[in-house]
Structures are given as structure tokens and as C-alpha cells.
Amino acid sequence: MPVILNEKKQAEYIIEKGEVGNKPTSTLFLLAKYYRQKENLNKEQTFNKLNEFMEKNYKNYNSATWEDIIEDISKKANKYPLREIDYIEITKSEIDTIRNVCNIKYEKLLFTMLCYAKLYNKISDKNNGWVNTDIKELFRVARVSVRYRNDKFLYLNDLETDGLISFSNKNDNLNLRVTFIDDESEVILRVDDFRELGYEYLNHIGDGKFIHTREFLSTHP
């Protein structure tokens, strides 16, 4: 499922359009967070709202089958803050650093990792550039394809050697950290959609034809 920057607006869009999407559980969890945190509904009220939403919008909905799932979602939704981020800002210094790599695949990957790192920095002021996203997802969103699976780690090792990213010292932690974030430089780009970051980068440098739309995401994978 793509990253949603503004979950409040996305929840309101889903309610208005009645879109369950291909991952109903993810949709329900987002709506539950909205009902609990923005409409201040309790667990029981949230349960009823979610049940009504599914009855109205999910074909062949069986309330008995979904009862335990919706009850659990309604209970946990208050533990995870509803994200309300309109965009993340990219600076001239950051883009210049990426352009200096002079390899379009590496550039798209670095731009994607930078966007995720700055998103996580907005979510937590203690994040310090770390990217808690699956490597496979980063390559997918960056639109960087490799011939063999292990090639992904060769790419990352190259970027680490150049000092652009670093890895956790813990053997069981695959998270990476972007080391060239510079919030003091001039802001030259605002990113409000994480679906196609590789194409977003190409558009910015003038090599892309990707049309950026403002339509909100459906909760599709």
C-alpha cells in the first residue's frame, strides 16, 4: 500500500467515495483512526461506523465474518496518531548532491530514500534521517529495476561507500539512514505524493513525462 501523507484527507475521501480498495483491513484501520481521533468516537461507535461502511460499500459483506477484525481495529486505532502532512520539502543542496552521482538509477533511488527519510523526520523529530521502509518497496517506488535480487544490495553498498547512506550497526536491522539531508538550504521542491517518486524526480530534472495528479489515493496496493 502506498504511503499516505495526509491520512485525514484520505479518510474523508474514502468516506465520500465509498472506496474499500483491495486491502479492506487497511482501509478500515485508516477510517478507525479518523473516527477515534477526529470525530472522538468511542470503540463501540467506531465499530458501528465501520460496520455500516462495509455494509454499504463491500460486496457480499458478512458482518459475522468481520466482527472480530473490526472490533480489534476499533480498539487499537487510538494508539497510532493520524498523520496530517501536506508535503515534504526538498532543498537545492539535496538535489545537487543527488545530481552529482551522475547515474540515473542511483539518483532516483537516492531521491526516493531522501523523501522517505524526510517524511519520517516530520513524523518524529528524533528520527535523524532513518528510513524504516522495506528495500523492495524503495526500489519499486523509485522505479529502479535490477537483474538479480542481490543487485539491490550492491547498489546500496555503492551508495554507502560514497557516504550518502549508512546502515544500522545491528545485524538484524536493515534500516538505512540518509546522510545528506540539508534543511538549511533553499527549498526548491515540495512532494505531496509518494506513489511514483522515481518519476517525480525525472520530472523535476526535466527527463520525465509523468503527469502528477492531485487525486487522492485509493487504498490499493
Cite the ranges covered by each PLM segment.
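Modules that initiate DNA replication and primer synthesis
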Residues: 1-110, 114-206, 215-220
